[in-house]
Amino acid sequence: MGVALWLCPKRNTPTYDKLITVMSSLNTLFPGSPPKFEPHITITTNISLDLADQSKTKDDVDRILSASAVAMNSLPKNHESLVKLGNVNSQRKFFKKLYFEVEKDPNLVSFARIIRELFVIVPQDIEKENIKQNPQLYTKDNNGNTIRRKPSKKKSKTTEVKEFDTSFIRQAAAYKAAEWSVQEFDPHISLVYSDLWPLHSALWRNINTRISDIDWDIEWEFGVLKLVLCEGDVNDWVVLGSVDIH
């Protein structure tokens, strides 16, 4: 997943408190110790971010969060709530073991499409083209992945870099993002991460009982946007930065 953008309800709100309560309760129904995590909707994963240079990482995080906040605040104010919860569902996947479906609100879909285009597809496709145009800037790591060469500390002849037009790449990215938002974007709020499968009928009865104990007539507009490094164990995930949306 790499770096993901999350949309979270604000802390100390009815939505946040209810989700935390039911997530903690449901965790006890599953074997082992399922990892704990914040309630969130994943807007997109695989955001392009330079994690090698910490000073540059901070600038990139601030830039992405600022642009994301602008994009969200520019959405049409044509209805009350951006996020509306649907049914509880389950899949075989670890990260979608138990979750609330979230309605594909047109504004939420538009926001996800914008973020996917600007911070996933465009940088990835420009990098791919740069590898073709300027292979001298890249090398292979021990796993055979193409990575940028580190600048040499030795004085050497300046490497000539070929410039190329990115307008077509950016244009194509808009179409790719639109297609992704329709076919792949699946907004949801995970409740439990687990390897357990299938969920037997007795477990489902307990799940439904615990969920029905809470008034789920909740929805939220805006909230908090967080960039999260989702690598390794869930308990090791790191929030790189956040911004409140008003």
Swiss-Prot record:
Belongs to the 2H phosphoesterase superfamily. CPD1 family. Keywords: Golgi apparatus, Hydrolase. It catalyses: a nucleoside 2',3'-cyclic phosphate + H2O = a nucleoside 2'-phosphate + H(+). One of its GO terms (molecular function) is 2',3'-cyclic-nucleotide 3'-phosphodiesterase activity. The active site is at 40 (proton donor/acceptor), 188 (proton donor/acceptor). Residues 147-156 have a biased composition (Basic residues). Its EC number is 3.1.4.37. One of its GO terms (biological process) is cyclic nucleotide metabolic process. It comes from the Eukaryota. This is 2',3'-cyclic-nucleotide 3'-phosphodiesterase. Residues 133-159 are annotated as: Disordered. GO terms for cellular component: Golgi apparatus. It comes from Candida albicans (strain SC5314 / ATCC MYA-2876) (Yeast). Residues 133-146 have a biased composition (Polar residues). It is found in: Golgi apparatus. Involved in the metabolism of ADP-ribose 1',2'-cyclic phosphate which is produced as a consequence of tRNA splicing. Substrate binds at residues 42, 190, 193. Gene3D superfamilies: Cyclic phosphodiesterase (3.90.1140.10).
